Amino acid sequence: MARTVNCVYLNKEAEGLGFQLYPGDLGKRIFDNVSKEAWALWQSKQTMLINEKKLNMMNVDDRKFLEEQMVNFLFEGKDVEIEGYVPQKDDE
């Protein structure tokens, strides 16, 4: 049976991550409180941020910025804002 967590992002019980994906205390907090589904949502936002803002993961300041955005997204309910990005509308 899959491990479940009370996901702080989705506000519901959901399947948890298989293992700790991020180092340190923040990684433990993510592992204990963020679901697989919420993590996948973050990964797509993270990819957009890296590409649109041309972040370099070798740069400490860029990594710090990305970590701040991750905490804001997963734990504080703040969406990632990317200048000029317009979400695709679902065709009805």
Swiss-Prot record:
Does the keyword field hold Iron?
yes
Top-rank taxon, per record: Bacteria
**Gene Ontology cellular component?**
cytosol
Q: Which GO terms describe its biological process?
A: cellular response to oxidative stress
Entry keyword set: Iron
GO MF terms, alphabetically ordered = iron ion binding
Please give the Gene3D superfamilies that the UniProt record associates with this protein. Fe(II) trafficking protein YggX
Q: Which InterPro entries does this one have? A: Fe_traffick_prot_YggX, Fe_traffick_prot_YggX_sf
**Keyword presence, Transcription regulation:** no
Listed transmembrane segments: none
Which SUPFAM superfamilies does this entry report, sorted A to Z? Answer: YggX-like
Instruction: Report the protein's function.
Output: Could be a mediator in iron transactions between iron acquisition and iron-requiring processes, such as synthesis and/or repair of Fe-S clusters in biosynthetic enzymes.
Q: Which PANTHER family match?
A: FE(2+)-TRAFFICKING PROTEIN-RELATED (PTHR36965:SF1)
Family the entry assigns: Belongs to the Fe(2+)-trafficking protein family.
**Mind telling me what this protein is named?**
Probable Fe(2+)-trafficking protein
Q: Which organism is it from?
A: Shewanella halifaxensis (strain HAW-EB4)
